[in-house]
């Protein structure tokens, strides 16, 4: 898999090794308490939805990997319905990016349906 497909999300499953920890100590930044956190999650089954719901209710954004399921899978349809309901309840947003990711946002954050470069 080339670098561009990794950046743009082309195919293949992701692991925690695909995410690189960046050392911010080399940068002069003001590091206060963040009002929002971004969580990465994997959805293997219905039980994984609880932690995602809790994170969104707590005001955090979640990017969930759904590569273990097909989007036509009845379990996945039920999971997506549950997450849609959470997004509605908190006045957030939810989108599915390709066949491998779902992004769920908390109150006050919407997701543009248009690419920046396209």
From Swiss-Prot:
The lineage of its organism: Archaea, Methanobacteriati, Methanobacteriota, Stenosarchaea group, Halobacteria. Disruption phenotype: Depletion of this protein leads to formation of large cells with a cragged cell surface, which are unable to establish a cell division plane. It comes from Haloferax volcanii (strain ATCC 29605 / DSM 3757 / JCM 8879 / NBRC 14742 / NCIMB 2012 / VKM B-1768 / DS2). One of its GO terms (biological process) is cell division. This is Cell division protein SepF. GO terms for molecular function: identical protein binding; protein homodimerization activity. It comes from the Archaea. It is found in: Cytoplasm. Residues 1-12 are annotated as: Important for localization in a ring-like structure at midcell. GO terms for cellular component: cell division site; cytoplasm. Involved in cell division. Probably acts as a membrane anchor for FstZ2, tethering its filaments to the division site. May be involved in septum closure. Homodimer. Does not oligomerize. Interacts with FtsZ2.
């Amino acid at each position: 898999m080339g670098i561009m497909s990794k950046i743009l999300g082309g195919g293949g499953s992701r692991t925690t090794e695909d995410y690189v920890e960046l050392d911010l100590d080399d940068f002069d930044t003001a590091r206060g308490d963040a009002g929002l956190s971004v969580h990465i999650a994997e959805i293997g089954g219905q039980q994984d939805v609880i932690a995602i719901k809790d994170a969104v209710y707590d005001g955090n954004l979640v990017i969930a990997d759904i590569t273990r399921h097909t989007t036509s899978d009845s379990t996945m349809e039920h999971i997506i319905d549950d997450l849609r309901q959470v997004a509605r309840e908190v006045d957030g947003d939810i989108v599915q990016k390709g066949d491998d990711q779902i992004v769920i946002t908390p109150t006050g954050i919407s997701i543009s349906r248009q690419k920046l470069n396209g």
